[in-house]
């Protein structure tokens, strides 16, 4: 009977550990200074870009930049959100074509976008790619590629 209870408890714990929503909720978020601010230096909001290739310059005030995996106070790394809304702010930031990770501590990036309107927004992530508490993100800007 005791063996069955222990095995049942272990199976329940394994299921909870595999559940990403439980894992994300169980992690404490990394604190950020209340006055931290992420911003896009270039391109400016409303810019018209010819050819689709552009550099994005990323800025940050009142925090430092460091590579992923470095767990120090008041630091993080940039994530650029392209043509999407902010992801859930209490979970790891996705890594896909709309959520670009700059885990080496980059502060500028080369993008190639198809013609049309596009939105860009920065979101800072901690050593585990989870937004800080409070989250540090830029204003969403819109650019047009000709």
What kind of feature is each model-predicted range?
Residues 3-7:
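N-terminal export leaders
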Residues 134-146:
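Short beta-strand elements
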Residues 70-78, 137:
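Short coil-to-beta strand junction motifs in C2/discoidin
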Residues 52, 76, 114-116:
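A glycine-anchored, Pro-Gly-centered beta-turn/N-cap motif
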Residues 27-51:
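Short, compositionally biased P/S/T/A/G/V-rich stretches that sit at domain boundaries
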Residues 59-70:
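Short amphipathic, basic-aromatic surface patches that mediate peripheral association
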Residues 87-89, 125-133:
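Short acidic/polar inter-strand loop motif in beta-rich domains
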């Amino acid at each position: 009977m005791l063996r069955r209870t222990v095995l049942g408890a272990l199976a329940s714990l394994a299921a909870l550990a595999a559940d990403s929503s439980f894992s994300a909720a169980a992690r404490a978020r990394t604190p950020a200074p209340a006055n931290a601010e992420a911003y896009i230096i270039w391109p400016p909001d409303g810019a018209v870009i010819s050819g689709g290739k552009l550099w994005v310059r990323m800025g940050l005030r009142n925090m430092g930049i460091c590579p992923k995996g470095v767990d120090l106070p008041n630091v993080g790394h940039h994530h650029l959100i392209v043509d999407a809304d902010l992801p859930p702010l209490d979970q790891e930031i996705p890594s896909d074509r709309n959520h670009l990770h700059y885990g080496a501590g980059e502060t500028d990036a080369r993008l190639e976008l198809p013609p049309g309107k596009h939105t860009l927004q920065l979101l800072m992530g901690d050593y585990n790619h989870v937004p800080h508490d409070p989250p540090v993100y830029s204003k969403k800007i819109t650019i047009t590629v000709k």
